[in-house]
């Protein structure tokens, strides 16, 4: 009896302690957010902050994140607050609000990532920074990713596409894994030109794969954990890159590729050359940005074309005409030909909208900011919700329908932001689209494929892709027929997709 009484007392103590912590936390939040440090009470956006310390993180991860954000928008409107991943956040789901944060008042919101992510990629990487350093570096990076450089890169992208499809031929494989290989190869040739030997390439691929596995892991530095292994692999990556830079300097040939441009740039403080650390951070950052996002979109494109057979035949007809002009594919694709793929380009735009690989982006308010009568407190995270905007019927009619014809007319300003917006928009977006165009050309004119198993479920790794990476069997078919009847005259296919 005495033991039971003691247990009751102990349990009651901890319940009381938890209740007092809750009261302390909520009262502290109210003082902080309703007049603390302000002459008048502030008005926060509507929403829920969830449980103390935990916030609404459990709700976010117990369901599709897009469903979580969509339900919040439906309940609270286009600006609402929440508390996730240990941070108070303001979510913005309107084009005007996204432009406010990313363009017109971008100086009030800094890019922000968890410290563990910065450590893994490198704190000097382009997308972790702002201000003069960011502007100098962005201008530098845009050179090797601009039209002139991409024009010369078409043969390399085409070679990478051919190699990827050839290795897949006759096999059942994860589409996502195949597309990751392709995106990595394109990233390597963009960074290093054609000057990287296979040994170095294998070292980079092997260590980057370990970094990638640990990117979303819990930041635990105990030996054996994914995070620990990723940090060790990141150090080895830095070592490989340092060796490559040392070899180039010894030859007196830094090169004109992205690595060479970074090595010769005076984008550092006070016009100084970038340090090897800064160069390595940016190379690893480019590899990260170039691989998973592009591979995810390519995976969805393969699925969307498979699921809409008449659309596939219309795309095949467009690409077959280009193939015929290239002597049945014996001649290489040209930059001009990639600019002429009108229907294929619309398919890519609709895939970017429909999949919305980048559902949102993180910013942090550097001062108290007022927007439409609401306060965004200093230090709060701010998240423009791209997917919510891309799937809003006010901007895209019947948004759950895959309809490339909607891009016959340009979307309303700030309603379509697959690569972000403002000074932090992805500088490699044209390279990504070139990769997609070349992949589609060779896929539809030389191969057939079928999806194995269900493709309706979605997984996050870390970007959304069909479950298991979209298992598919692909086989070579040089006799691919082109059935164009009704496919280029605005007819609907069997899946209700309007053709362009």
From Swiss-Prot:
The gene is CYP707A7. It comes from the Eukaryota. It is a single-pass membrane protein. PANTHER family: ABSCISIC ACID 8'-HYDROXYLASE 4, CYTOCHROME P450 26. Its cofactor is heme. Its EC number is 1.14.14.137. This is Abscisic acid 8'-hydroxylase 3. It is found in: Membrane. PROSITE patterns: CYTOCHROME_P450. Pathway: Plant hormone degradation; abscisic acid degradation. It comes from Oryza sativa subsp. indica.
């Amino acid at each position: 009896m005495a033991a039971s009484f003691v247990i009751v007392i102990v349990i009651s103590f901890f319940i009381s302690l938890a209740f007092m912590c809750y009261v302390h936390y909520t009262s502290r939040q109210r003082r902080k957010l309703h007049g603390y440090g302000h002459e008048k009470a502030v008005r926060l956006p509507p929403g829920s902050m969830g449980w103390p310390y935990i916030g609404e993180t459990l709700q976010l991860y117990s369901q599709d994140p897009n469903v979580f954000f969509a339900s919040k928008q439906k309940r609270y409107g286009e600006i609402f607050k929440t508390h996730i991943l240990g941070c108070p956040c303001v979510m913005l789901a309107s084009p005007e609000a996204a432009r406010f944060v990313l363009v017109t008042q971008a100086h009030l919101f800094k890019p922000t990532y968890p410290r563990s992510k910065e450590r893994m990629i490198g704190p000097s990487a382009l997308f972790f920074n702002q201000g003069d350093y960011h502007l100098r570096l962005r201008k530098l990076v845009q050179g090797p990713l601009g039209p002139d450089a991409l024009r010369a890169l078409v043969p390399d992208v085409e070679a990478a596409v051919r190699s990827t499809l050839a290795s897949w031929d006759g096999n059942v494989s994860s589409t996502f894994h195949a597309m990751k290989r392709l995106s990595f190869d394109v990233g390597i040739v963009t960074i290093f030109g054609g000057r990287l030997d296979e040994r170095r390439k294998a070292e980079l691929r092997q260590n980057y794969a370990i970094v990638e596995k640990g990117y979303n892991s819990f930041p635990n530095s105990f030996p054996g954990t994914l995070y620990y292994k990723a940090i060790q692999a990141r150090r080895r990556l830095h070592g490989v890159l340092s060796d490559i830079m040392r070899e180039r300097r010894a030859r007196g040939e830094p090169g004109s590729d992205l690595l060479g441009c970074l090595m010769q740039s005076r984008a550092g403080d006070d016009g100084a050359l970038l340090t090897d650390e800064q160069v390595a951070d940016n190379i690893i950052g480019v590899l990260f940005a170039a691989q998973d996002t592009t591979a995810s979109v390519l995976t969805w494109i393969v699925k969307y074309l498979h699921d809409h057979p008449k659309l596939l035949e219309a795309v095949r007809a467009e690409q077959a005409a280009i193939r015929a002009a290239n002597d049945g594919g014996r001649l290489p694709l040209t930059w001009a030909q990639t600019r002429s793929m009108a229907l294929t380009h619309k398919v890519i735009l609709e895939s970017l909208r429909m999949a919305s690989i980048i559902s949102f982006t993180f910013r942090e308010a550097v001062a108290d900011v007022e927007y439409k009568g609401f306060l965004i407190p200093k230090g709060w995270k701010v998240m423009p919700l791209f997917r919510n905007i891309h799937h809003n019927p006010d901007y895209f009619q019947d948004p759950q329908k895959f309809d490339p014809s909607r891009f016959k007319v340009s979307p309303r300003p700030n309603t379509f932001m697959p690569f972000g917006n403002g000074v932090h928009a992805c500088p490699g977006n044209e390279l990504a689209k070139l990769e997609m165009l070349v992949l589609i050309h060779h896929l539809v004119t030389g191969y057939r494929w079928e999806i194995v198993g269900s493709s309706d479920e979605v997984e996050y790794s870390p970007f959304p892709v069909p479950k298991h990476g979209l298992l598919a069997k692909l086989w070579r078919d040089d006799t691919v027929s082109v059935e164009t009847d009704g496919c280029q005259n605005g007819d609907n296919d069997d899946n209700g997709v309007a053709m362009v």
